[in-house]
């Protein structure tokens, strides 16, 4: 498998075949091509087909109301008792809602609400508890801020479905659908967005000698496989 990485060109004067990445302000005129068995090499953008180049220079067309012309900031709302920050404050549901609304006022573009800690060593939380923690918060934030874009941080399809019904529009799954085989079906059913993450094992054991042959290429291969599975389930790349 070959992976192509734009080589950024900050010195535009005199450079040939300059292109902007996804219609933004960053320019490039070459790719670093990386393969597992052949290492990497640099080629000019003129050496690739125009249709392939379009994937890098076309402006993203999100179906989620996100503007990719600027930096997007995600505000994180940990509705868990063992959060390194939120949990230590012993917030009530009302306070979590207020904090979420303040994050939106401060300029966050996506509000990520999670009811299960997935830090290294964390134990799994029952779906019923996770639902109890996040659904009321999501509903009340959407009532006060109807245009807010909310993601739910969960590995479980039933939690994702309840959150989408409550007003979330994105599922942020650290397991990329590996933990719950029904996850992609729920995302497709509700035409939601999905954020695919990488991890080895479960939070309980993720730090017990994780092994990679090539950490970058292993992660790229993993995410490529998950993207293909999501698409085969009916989830558009635009989501």
PLM feature spans:
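Glycine-rich, proline-tolerant flexible connector loops at the mouths of alpha/beta enzymes
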Residues: 81-85, 109-136
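Catalytic beta/alpha-barrel core
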Residues: 130, 147-155, 169-180, 215-219
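Conserved, mostly hydrophobic/aromatic
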Residues: 77, 103, 107, 153, ...
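N-terminal accessory interaction module
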Residues: 1-65
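Glycine-rich anion/phosphate-binding loops
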Residues: 51-58, 84-104, 129-132, 176-181, ...
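Structural preference for beta-strand elements that scaffold enzyme active sites
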Residues: 30, 72-76, 109-112, 149-151, ...
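Alpha-helix-loop-beta-strand connector modules within alpha/beta enzyme cores
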Residues: 68, 123-152, 161, 188-199
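Conserved anion-binding
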Residues: 79-83, 118-121, 166, 178-239
């Amino acid at each position: 498998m070959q992976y192509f990485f734009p080589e950024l060109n900050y010195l535009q004067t005199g450079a040939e075949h300059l292109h902007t990445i996804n219609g933004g302000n960053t320019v490039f005129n070459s790719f670093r091509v990386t393969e597992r068995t052949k290492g990497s090499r640099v080629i000019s953008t003129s050496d690739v087909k125009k249709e392939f180049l379009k994937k890098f220079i076309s402006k993203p067309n999100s179906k989620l109301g996100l503007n990719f012309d600027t930096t997007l900031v995600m505000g994180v709302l940990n509705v868990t008792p063992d959060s390194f920050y939120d949990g230590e404050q012993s917030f009530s549901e009302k306070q979590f809602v207020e904090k979420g609304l303040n994050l939106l006022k401060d300029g966050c573009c996506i509000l990520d609400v999670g009811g299960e800690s997935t830090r290294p060593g964390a134990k799994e939380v029952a779906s019923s508890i996770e639902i109890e923690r996040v659904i009321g918060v999501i509903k009340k934030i959407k009532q006060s801020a109807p245009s807010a874009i909310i993601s739910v941080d969960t590995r479980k399809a039933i939690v994702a479905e309840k959150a989408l019904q409550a007003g979330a529009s994105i599922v942020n799954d650290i397991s990329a659908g590996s933990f719950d085989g029904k996850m992609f079906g729920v995302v497709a059913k509700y035409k939601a967005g999905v954020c695919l993450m990488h991890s080895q094992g479960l939070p309980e054991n993720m730090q017990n000698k994780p092994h990679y042959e090539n950490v970058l290429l292993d992660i790229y291969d993993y995410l490529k496989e998950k993207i293909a599975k999501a698409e085969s389930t009916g989830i558009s790349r635009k989501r």
